[in-house]
Amino acid sequence: MAVSAARRVAYEVLLRVFEQDAYADRVFRTAARDLDERERAFAQRLSYGAVQRVRTLDYAIDTLGKRPVRKLDPPVRAALRLGAYQLGYTDTAPHAAANESVELVRRARLERAVPFTNAVMRRLTEGIRPLLDSLPDGPLKESYPDWIAETFERDLGHDDALALMRAMNEPLETVVRVVRGDPPLGAEPTDLPGAYRVERVDELAVAEGRIWPQSRGSQLAGLVVGSQDGERVLDLCSAPGGKTSQLRGDVTAVELDPNRANELRENLAKLGATNVTVVEADGTKLPPDLQGFDRALVDAPCSGLGVLGQRPDLRWRATPLPELQLALLRSAAERVRPGGTIVYSVCTINAEENEAVVEASGLEVLPLGEEWPQYAHPRLSQFLLTLPHVHGTSGFFIGRLQV
């Protein structure tokens, strides 16, 4: 029997992500390039949903299949995960999910595993929904590593942690920044200047540099910098360039990775950001001539716990980076003139990478909560913290500091 193009793509994504440590978005872009819009949307839902929910799916397969997932052949493991996701979380016809999972195993030339796959899919068809309903609220039911759930609970409390995990398992708003020209047809204004909600991103408008896909959390970080014409601005860790292109003044954008630096240059040219000079350098070891800046943006690498909804595999590979973040912040402080300001932003919800890094820097905090009260940090109002379950956008911590 045939296997739909969307399921073939989702199966490939599951195989590559969990067996070859590939990145879901990169595999998906390549695998889905020939799909039409409808197939692509279905393939993305299956791919990203199954990757996100894999902890819960594996529990269901272990429980109902009566054989540990880790001991299965990789193609069988991927096919069962795909089938289980459809049965547990979509309205796909059960026979289609089961039959095509079996066919994927057959096509992998694992005929000996076909009866087992068929039997497990039958058990999942009958039992996965009751099993999912019986799970207690928490990281197993919502499919997060325990350490992430514990981090959220420590920083936000039990109820908000649970609401946050649920929110990042569902699609968030799609927002674009209007770079030039009119907003897209049907776009809805938001509370940020130039930021509009859209049903879908107009790829032609992106290619022409008229709009840029960028969450409100990300745009807020760029706005808080507040740079003006005539000022010298340092932007560390700049790629892919969304926030960089928001900055006014004479901007020096630093990026370590040569490939990402090239991507940054291409994006800035597309967006018409002629005020930016790209420098390939380590943000913790800047060239000596980069001195005397009026402002800096340190949009530091982080665990990404605020963008787990947009990056489905990140929850399984996330790593906190407080030492690197502090090194970057201190590096920026050495290059900004006395009295100048630094905006520290990270797309994570983790006190160890957020306020603890700011405190360790020893820099003076300039309060932000009164300027942006709707985004004020719930415990520390001098900072901003966008939260997916509260604001409907990606999670960002933002602090403004004075040298």
What are these regions (language model features)?
Residues 1-403:
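S-adenosylmethionine
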